[in-house]
Regions:
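Adenine nucleotide-associated cytosolic modules
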Residues: 1-180
Length: 180
């Protein structure tokens, strides 16, 4: 992750990332939050924003952020990594498309989807997927172009391939099926 440098070793990632972002652009506002995300905190935090970018490395956090984003009718740009592969989707309750839990109804069994810390990630991949997420966010903010709402873009850095698949809303989804 190029945002973290040797000078930041020993510093919590949230603060080293904050310092690097401000060093690149001192005209931005960064709000670093160093705390575990609980349902109460997520509800309060997500309420402050119009658009959610979710790039956590665990299913529990992804499910929680998705649940709150759907409840608050906020679009969520989701990015995930695994070794050489990255995935990106836009889940937008206002467009009545699927939510994250429609696509991943339950957490994979232990060992089937190792974390980034366990399996490792091709070093440039977080930057590639993060940049794609930023592009999706800008399209949503500017209301321009075609977003990945209802689709998943899968980038395979090992083979240099990109593919896109359509995603379907589940009528039995415990998170979004009750939305009209």
């Amino acid at each position: 992750q190029v945002i973290h440098t040797e000078e930041g070793i020993g510093t919590p990632k949230v603060f080293s990332a904050n310092a690097q972002m401000l060093a690149q652009n001192p005209h931005i506002e960064v709000k670093p939050y160093k705390r575990r995300l609980s349902e109460d905190i997520a509800t309060e935090l997500i309420a402050e924003y119009d658009l959610i970018l979710e790039g956590s490395d665990n299913f529990e956090t992804r499910y929680l952020v998705n649940k709150i984003a759907v409840a608050q009718n906020k679009p969520m740009v989701s990015g995930a990594l695994s070794q050489w592969e990255g995935q990106i989707s836009v889940f937008d309750p206002a467009r009545k498309g699927p939510c994250y839990q429609c696509i991943f109804p339950q957490k994979p069994a232990d060992g089937l989807a190792p974390s980034c810390a366990e399996a490792g990630v091709f070093a440039p991949l977080p930057g590639v997927i993060g940049t794609m997420m930023a592009g999706e966010a800008m399209k949503l903010i500017l209301k321009t172009g075609a977003t990945l709402t209802g689709s998943m873009l899968i980038y395979d850095a090992h083979f240099g391939e990109t593919r896109q698949i359509r995603l379907k809303k589940r009528t039995d989804c415990p998170i979004c099926s009750g939305q009209a």
